Amino acid sequence: GGPGGGYSWLQEHLGSGYLAAWHVPENKDAAVVNSGVSRWHNFYVEGLDWLVKHEKIDGLYIDDVAFDRTTMKRVRKVLDRGNPGAMIDLHSANQYNPRDGFASSANLYLEHFPFLNRLWFGEYFDYDSASDYWLVEVSGIPFGLMGEMLEKGGNPWRGMTMGMTARLPWSGDPAPLWKVWDGFGIQQSRMLGWWSGEAPVTTGDSAILATTWRRPGKAMVSLGSWRDADTKVTLRIDWKALGLDPARTRLRAPAIDQFQVAGSWGPGD
């Protein structure tokens, strides 16, 4: 049961005894909240199977999850069986509020993470929070997932230390940053995050963090500051871990629109 309400069609045809879901009036969305375990999920999974086979869909965008882990496993199997490589993308607004029972989105959906490919967390997330909040509650990295930013465009400098950008075209234009990633060959590199305990580049400042992407003969370093004011740091570089000779290496910052100006330094500058 429930208080009813919601879209006009529901009120006209169902009367009462149901729980209306979040909906978009312009799209005539007569959505209702169902139980987390329901025979409707059989209908949902069979529908996905039909779409994979006949429409060749290559993944799902899920805006919060209304079913259990068992159903998610079935969804994953249907996608993998019909279109290997299909992706599942989970979006969630921050559920840590009185209306949603102060539930961290990462904690709320943790049981689904093994079957997902990426996260988009999301409206109302606080990108001014500490780095450990970013890592655990936003990035997806501890769980083997990638993430993207949304609320007010996120923070591109902090986000890059975790491989995150805003999602085109919702908040800003990350294309200039993507171009630099592609030019470096980020897909062929090994990511050594500031949290890993083996970061070859550090700053000596616990609030200014560095993540390194290492390839044979070159490396890319991202710096993210959690300081409230401009701060100068000197990079501490483990040249042996990078496989680079400091006598033959320069540090270059390419110009990236709305991100940074160009610069060039020698080791020790």
Q: Which stretches of residues belong to each language-model region?
A:
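Active-site-adjacent "subsite" loops/lids of carbohydrate-active enzymes
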Residues: 1-55
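Short, solvent-exposed coil/turn linker segments
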Residues: 29-30, 34, 236-238, 266
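Active-site and adjacent substrate-binding regions of carbohydrate-active enzymes
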Residues: 36-87, 93
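Active-site-proximal substrate-binding groove within the catalytic cores of carbohydrate-active enzymes
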Residues: 73-255
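Catalytic core of carbohydrate-active enzymes
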Residues: 255-262
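C-terminal beta-strand-rich structural cap/linker in extracellular carbohydrate-active enzymes
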Residues: 262-269
